[in-house]
């Protein structure tokens, strides 16, 4: 069989039944490729996580039409997250065809509990390995070994000395491999049997990306000093250097297989250059990225390197995980472009403009094709903003001592997070950030995306509040009440950005408080008054962060024993005016990047005047909410004017940071 998806899709042939009831404990129907093909065959997926929400969708979109005798091409697929189909309501059991799908059926010779921990992105590789090597029945450990070898190309038996281990970890963390914790534990236990690695902090650096790069960062100056001294007076004792992480002080950065990663790590901001007298070092290109030399030369070298890296990464048919990973590369490049004192030469500007155009086109094509498949993915690793509350609830459950602070910085783009993060590190070097990213709701408006982040629901489930944030605190409280918290356990604070008042401080210090939602709206206020484009945004964010509000807020939260998570409801983009629609009060929201209508015919009429604009399909939105999105890097304002705004579907607007903050 060509693909594991074919096994699943064989159960779903068009026009078999109006409704199919599917036991899908592994979430296979949510995989991007399957979801896309199911939609192409006319199947609409309805999750049964929430009976009330399910009934709303099923009764309004399907059953009422079937009962009226309407002929429709749509077929409903009710997805249950367990195998207990018989627990469904009687009317559904009578009307529906029953199907069960599982990873155990696709990988019969591998240990199901181990395979079930793998991200979907790796199932193609695992299936190909199974077809090629036809393993006999494998137990847990043998399955872990099989996955390491054939999915992640890690053969534990070949890791014998430091260069071998460094190469494996560099490849793993640079590529952002998502190895399941249970497989990581197996690998760590194997490595711990080697005396060569007895002092290495394997429990931390094997699985923790940020910790691994911090481990490398504090050893990079030692390596440079060794080169300068030509090997003389080098001490292997870590205590001499005051290292935070255990392990050898000197690492083989110059090994030919390792150094190919080093310049990439520096140019992408994963490692940071350190002061060193270049004259004392070998004249090797790969080292120069890691030392502070002439600022202008360093800037141009790094920006060219980042442009190369961005171009190399872009591929057809990228999955959502790849776009989230790519977004950080792109954000580093944008932050570098807009925060430097050095102007870009015309050739660099032309290359950047070409990149922006290419990314806009590829991302829009992907969004139109795959965005709908993201909505019902598991919140275990949040992919969209409305997944975050359920992710937080999982972390809160089971331990009454856990406290969570959910800090949303309204309007903060991912590239602006890079600037904010860098200043925070300067102000407090103990702060550590575990960085990931999530997709915002489209249209990327505060009333849509921010409310989804606090409600933990699709916007279609708060239709009366979709045009205002006045009841956002109620949505936040309602979500946590459904998780079993009382009103005294929950807090919500908005309008932050300048100072932390005594009233806010008292709220955060309440003994019973378990979860608090905080909104910093300073960035959004800067954006809506910005006349100097994206570069001006970065400058204002740099100045504001320097004032210390964010540092102080994070300190209060961490000192109060909160687990702190930062995100944004959407980003922003510099856009050029293409003219204002002449339609009076027809549009309910007359935004710069998006116009909202209650009637699709009114939207279509406006599109006729702006043929390159996009009639956004109302994915997850209320029935009377129709968005017309301005073309790439364009705005519905006076022709030729330039603003910074949001509402559209550029990667800068749609992919938002999701950060866990700790302090060493």
Outline where the language-model segments fall.
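…; additionally, a secondary subgroup of soluble metalloenzymes is captured
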Residues: 1-404, 411-564, 568-664
């Amino acid at each position: 069989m060509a693909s594991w998806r074919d096994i699943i899709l064989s159960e779903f042939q068009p026009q078999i039944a109006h409704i199919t009831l599917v036991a899908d404990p592994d979430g296979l129907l949510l995989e991007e490729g399957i979801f896309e093909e199911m939609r192409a065959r006319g199947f609409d997926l309805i999750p049964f996580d929430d009976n009330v929400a399910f009934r709303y969708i099923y009764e309004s979109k399907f059953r009422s039409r079937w009962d009226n005798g309407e002929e429709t091409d749509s077929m409903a697929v009710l997805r249950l997250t367990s195998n207990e189909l018989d627990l469904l309501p009687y009317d559904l059991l009578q009307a529906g065809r029953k199907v069960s799908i599982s990873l155990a059926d696709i990988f019969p010779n591998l240990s199901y509990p181990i395979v079930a921990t793998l991200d979907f992105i790796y199932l193609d590789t695992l299936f190909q390995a199974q077809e090629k090597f036809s393993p006999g029945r494998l137990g847990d450990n043998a399955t872990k070994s099989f996955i390491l070898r054939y999915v992640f190309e890690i053969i534990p038996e070949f890791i014998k000395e430091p260069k071998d281990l460094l190469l494996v970890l560099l490849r793993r963390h640079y590529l952002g491999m998502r190895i399941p914790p249970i497989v990581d534990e197996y690998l760590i236990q194997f490595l711990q049997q080697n005396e060569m690695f007895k002092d290495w902090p394997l429990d931390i650096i094997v699985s923790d990306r940020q910790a691994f790069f911090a481990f490398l960062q504090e050893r990079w100056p030692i390596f440079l000093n060794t080169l300068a001294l030509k090997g003389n007076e080098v001490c292997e004792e870590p205590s001499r250097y005051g290292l935070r992480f255990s392990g050898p002080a000197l690492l083989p950065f110059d090994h030919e297989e390792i150094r190919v990663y080093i310049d990439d790590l520096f140019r992408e901001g994963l490692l940071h250059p350190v002061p060193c007298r270049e004259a004392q070092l070998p004249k090797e290109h790969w080292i120069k990225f890691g030392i502070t030399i002439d600022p202008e030369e360093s800037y141009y070298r790094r920006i060219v390197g980042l442009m190369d890296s961005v171009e190399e990464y872009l591929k057809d048919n990228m999955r959502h995980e790849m776009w989230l990973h790519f977004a950080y590369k792109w954000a580093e490049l944008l932050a570098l472009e807009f925060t430097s004192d050095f102007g870009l030469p015309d050739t660099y500007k032309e290359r950047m403009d070409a990149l922006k155009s290419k990314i806009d086109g590829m991302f829009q094509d992907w969004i139109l094709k795959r965005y709908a498949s993201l909505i019902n993915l598991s919140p275990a690793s949040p992919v969209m903003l409305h997944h975050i509350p359920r992710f937080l609830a999982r972390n809160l459950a089971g331990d009454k001592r856990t406290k969570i602070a959910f800090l949303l910085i309204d309007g903060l783009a991912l590239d602006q997070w890079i600037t904010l993060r860098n200043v925070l590190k300067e102000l407090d070097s103990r702060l550590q950030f575990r960085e990931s990213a999530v997709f915002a709701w489209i249209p990327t408006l505060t009333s849509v995306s921010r409310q989804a982040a606090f409600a933990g629901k699709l916007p279609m489930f708060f239709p009366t509040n979709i045009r205002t944030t006045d009841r956002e605190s109620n949505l936040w409280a309602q979500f946590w009440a459904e998780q079993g918290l009382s009103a005294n356990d929950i807090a919500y604070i908005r309008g932050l950005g300048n100072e932390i008042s005594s009233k806010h401080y008292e709220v955060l210090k309440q003994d019973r408080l378990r979860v608090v939602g905080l909104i910093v709206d300073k960035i959004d206020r800067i954006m809506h008054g910005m006349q100097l484009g994206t570069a001006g945004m970065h400058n204002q964010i740099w100045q504001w962060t320097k004032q210390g509000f964010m540092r102080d807020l994070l300190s209060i939260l961490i000192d109060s024993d909160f687990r702190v998570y930062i995100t944004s409801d959407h980003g922003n983009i510099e856009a050029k005016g293409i003219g204002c629609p002449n339609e009076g009060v027809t549009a309910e929201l007359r935004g710069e990047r998006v116009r909202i209508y209650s009637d699709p015919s009114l939207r279509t009429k406006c599109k006729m005047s702006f043929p390159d604009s996009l009639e956004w399909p109302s994915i997850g939105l209320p029935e009377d909410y129709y968005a017309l999105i301005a073309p790439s890097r364009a705005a519905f304002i006076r022709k030729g004017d330039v603003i910074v705004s949001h509402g559209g579907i550029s990667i800068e607007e749609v992919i938002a940071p999701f950060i866990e903050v700790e302090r060493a």
